[in-house]
Amino acid sequence: MTILALGINHKTASVNLRSKVAFDDQKRQLAFEQIQHRALAESVVILSTCNRTELYFHNAEITPREEHEDNIAWREQCFEWFAEIHQLEHNELRECIYFKQNMESARHLMRVACGLDSLILGEPQILGQVKQAYQYSENFYQSQNSHISTKLSRLFQRTFSTAKRVRSETEIGSSAVSVAYAACGLARQIFDNFGKLRFLLVGAGETIELVARYLIQHGAKNIMIANRTPQRAETLAERLNTPMQILSLSALQIGLNQADIVISSTGSPDMLISKEMVEIAQKQRQFDPMLLIDIAVPRDIDENAGELDAVYSYSVDDLQHIIQRNMAQREQAAEQAAQIVDEECKAFFEWLKQQQSSDLIKRYRQDAEQTRQELLAKALVALTSGQDSEKVLNELSYKLTNSLLHVPTQALQAMAKSGNSQGLQSFSKALKLEEQ
């Protein structure tokens, strides 16, 4: 039995190549069908994100020893299929692709799900993507009146519980390491109840979208968006499925007069919010605390605005200092997380070994029972035909003993022939035999 991980990621391949090996819904469905038709694996889970494409195969018939010729041949078959479905030359993929099997494949999957292998260390989105990949696979096999193999399913369930444990026992995801999240984290440190605050977001690009999503997730209900093109701000509000007040840049002063927190990120070459505008707003607001976070380069907000009473002003440079400090904390937490992954990985393989021994014992007993029934049937026929009962029973016991001892005897002879003294000793101990 072998679990094989095959993939490329942001560490091994360019964006261009990663885009070529991505699986959309149509290609994923085709992949499931081809893998099943070619009997490449008993089950497979396909993980495809912007930063990685990985396939986790389970094949019960392949030896787990990496150097074994069956294993090498199977890995090559999987690689050739992967190149074929993406219509890529082998040479283009060979240097970028990686293979991991059994313990290493399980450890890799757990590290991926915990965010330890992500471009942004500890990012939480990858766990949801791994869960979605598993669900896609489960849906396919159910549509075929089948299911994901027990062992591969157990690996993914163990992975999900490991990621949950890492999140609860370490600080891997507690500190913001992106500008957008750092800005929102700073706002939460200064104001504790987003639901009662009024926000002004300036811009409607990717960074502001991330900011808006974070604010909404943490209870913000009163958000204004000011943008040079109001239609783009309206599109953003629709995408977020949240009612927002849309302003043009010419109406910035109106928004400032109402805002407790201003977060700005535009591509404007000119400053948009002057110290004088903030001063006017503060008079309108009766000098209630105001937080200004400028994450634009060049600046959107006058750096001198922070000199005003009850105004807290931060720039992208301030946020970078926060991010650096938080990243150091995440790296420390990542060491703890890696230890948890190792523990859970070992625990999974202990379970796997128990399952394999149980399966082996079950098959051995089934074979023995089949032999017993066949010999018993012959003995009953002999007795019915009038043969001597003592002779029939002696023959039954003789043949049954020979049949049950045939395979173990062959194994002992093979070990003796190869000079496997350790194997002979283990066999002798297991059978409670005393050396003569």
Swiss-Prot record:
Active site: 50
Chemical reaction(s) catalysed: (S)-4-amino-5-oxopentanoate + tRNA(Glu) + NADP(+) = L-glutamyl-tRNA(Glu) + NADPH + H(+)
Site positions per UniProt: Important for activity: 108
Sites where the protein binds substrate: 49-52, 118, 123-125, 129
Pathway recorded for this protein: Porphyrin-containing compound metabolism; protoporphyrin-IX biosynthesis; 5-aminolevulinate from L-glutamyl-tRNA(Glu): step 1/2
Role: Catalyzes the NADPH-dependent reduction of glutamyl-tRNA(Glu) to glutamate 1-semialdehyde (GSA).
Family: Belongs to the glutamyl-tRNA reductase family.
Annotated domain remarks: Possesses an unusual extended V-shaped dimeric structure with each monomer consisting of three distinct domains arranged along a curved 'spinal' alpha-helix. The N-terminal catalytic domain specifically recognizes the glutamate moiety of the substrate. The second domain is the NADPH-binding domain, and the third C-terminal domain is responsible for dimerization.
Descriptive protein name: Glutamyl-tRNA reductase
